[in-house]
Amino acid sequence: MISNQTATHSHVADRLDSELLKFISTHAATPGDRVPPLDVLSRELGLSVTKLREQLEVARQLGLVEVRPRSGIKSVEYNFLPAIRQSLLFGLALNANLFQAYGELRNHTEAGFFKEAVARLTTADRQQLRSLVAAAQEKLQGHPVRIPHQEHRQLHIGMFRRLENPFVIGLLEAYWEAYEAVELNVFSDYKYLERVWDYHARIVECICAERLDEGLELLVEHAQLLRDRV
């Protein structure tokens, strides 16, 4: 079994276009592992320092390594967000209407993983969701009214925080990057915000009461509010 896993790992690494990423995936795969300096890698891999520097910058932008002046190059925990964020924002720069398509992907992802995700939440997690609802309602009832955008983002991400799936988490986090990029966080109709947060409050109460089928139904219903808005 171990030999099969090793062979599969090697086969996947061979498909990477970057010699640097191939090296990291096979020799420095654990988060915190140090990657040798570029001059050392240049000799070992037979590539110029210039070429390796280019590959390092790509790896850094993809969030696959950490680069600091004194500590050098280190592997980091795998995170899907940086890669998908760059592609998504580029797509929106070309055509802002793509936000609706990505929003549909996000809605189906949330609905598909909702029951599994919220079943894993701790008592403290659930209390945090309630606190976010209370903070948002306080902003909406204040003078002047404030848009509870951070609470909105934190609530949705918070419902899925215990999922051990970096692709789902990255996809959902990228949605909020896109939401802010198209400036849906800047202005909202007050009635829309009231309706959204009424749904949020009921969803959270369903989570806390373990009425997950009802909570899922409300989640799906509430997604229609943004469809109507955009």
Where in this protein do the model-derived segments appear?
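Short linear motifs at protein or domain termini
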Residues: M1-L105
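Solvent-exposed loop and edge beta-strand segments that line ligand/cofactor-binding
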Residues: S188, Y192
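Conserved amphipathic alpha-helical segments that form helical-bundle/coiled-coil interaction surfaces
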Residues: L105-L184, V196-H200, E205, E214-L225, ...
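Short, locally clustered residues in the helix-turn-helix/winged-helix DNA-binding domain
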Residues: S25-A29, V118, C208
